[in-house]
Amino acid sequence: VIGGGIIGVFAAYYLAKRGLSVTVVEKGRIGAEQSSRNWGWCRQQNRDARELPMATRSLELWEQFAADSGEDTGFRRCGLLYLSNDGDEIARWAKWRDFARTAGVTTHMLSGREASERGRDTGRAWKGGVFSPSDGTADPAKAAPSVAAALMKLGGIVQQNCAARGIELEGGRVSGVVTEAGTIKTRTVVFAGGAWASSFCRQLGIRFPQATVRQSIVRVSGVTEHLPDALHTARVSITRRSDGSYNLAISGRGRVDPTAQLLRFAPQFLPMFAKRWRNVFPGGLEGIRAGHETLARWRLDTPTPMERVRILDPKPDAAAVKQTYNRAVELVPALGKTGISNAWAGFVDNTPDGVPGIGELPEIPGFILAAGFSGHGFGIGPGAGHLIADLVTGDEPIFDPAPYNPVRFKQSAWGKVADF
């Protein structure tokens, strides 16, 4: 398994549970990129229809993992609260509620009175909202390392600070993984490399359309009031961390850095950017400096871009940090008592339709891709990992894998952009 984020470690864990010999190679540290830089939401609410089965099973698997492994990911079903004064937005939530009922998902539409009561910490009235009681959060700082620890209990191997440089083939099929520490012989590789997926696939002659969006999160500490565990509004969202601090973020807001890879795939991403133009802004040179979107090719016997940049750690967007904090304090004044503790950013790997690509690539038997989770992969990590293990072993899939098959990006230039 190449990549030690939440997708990679869960895939490795479920493979090890089936008795396979599993090694995870991670160029930096387990969970150090987007898997530890997200909100931590584990949700069914407002999921795109294609992802809902994965989201539903993932909630069950988060709980089952803790019971089976004894490891703590910080997962809890605290419920997610959405509030709005926009009639159109509330109508969209009601439409999603009607769809979700057909899938057996429970979600509660809130009247103005109910929304205002649940959102009383904001000190304002709301027209409506929605509460999803079975959804929850996990701790991004704990989750991937906890799963890696469980994997090692099962006999799996985790190699950190060990970059995978490429793949060896025999007769057109995977025969090994070349790492900076040597070659690992194997007939099956799972690539769960996040923002590095497209450039890695390019080395294999595979076109995987991917664009990264640089998003920022703000953290505040010392809040004595017990605010909602997870609250979303159109202007800002807040999430309570396991240590009592709060993460603040603006949903979908980010910067797109102009890179050669972005220009290469720009036509396929036009529908997505057109749908989200209000929150996506032109970026700068961060993407070029990071090197994960390079179009260059590299040799397997010399250091690669992954060894030069062990962990993608972009600077947070100063304007976004200021705007996020100001909006959060305006929404919940109690968040403004102590100021900003810290802020960080991450590169979110997106596909043109906002749905991940998971499946074996027909060009290279034995190579299974799992990437492009588009900023909402953390919560569905367990389900994705279980599905990957099913595909590797040939077991009956835990849910239909067809919507995630990466072959779709070759069959159609433009797919339906996901609803979030």
Where are each of the predicted segments found?
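C-terminal lid/capping helical subdomain adjacent to the catalytic/cofactor pocket in oxidative enzymes
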Residues: 7-10, 18, 109, 114, ...
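Helical element adjacent to the flavin cofactor pocket in flavoenzyme catalytic cores
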Residues: 130-188, 195-199
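Glycine-rich Rossmann-fold phosphate-binding loop(s) that bind the pyrophosphate
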Residues: 3-5, 27, 193
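Glycine-rich phosphate/pyrophosphate-binding beta-alpha loops
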Residues: 39-41, 47, 135-137, 256, ...
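Short beta-strand to alpha-helix junction loop
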Residues: 53-56, 82-92, 130-150, 159, ...
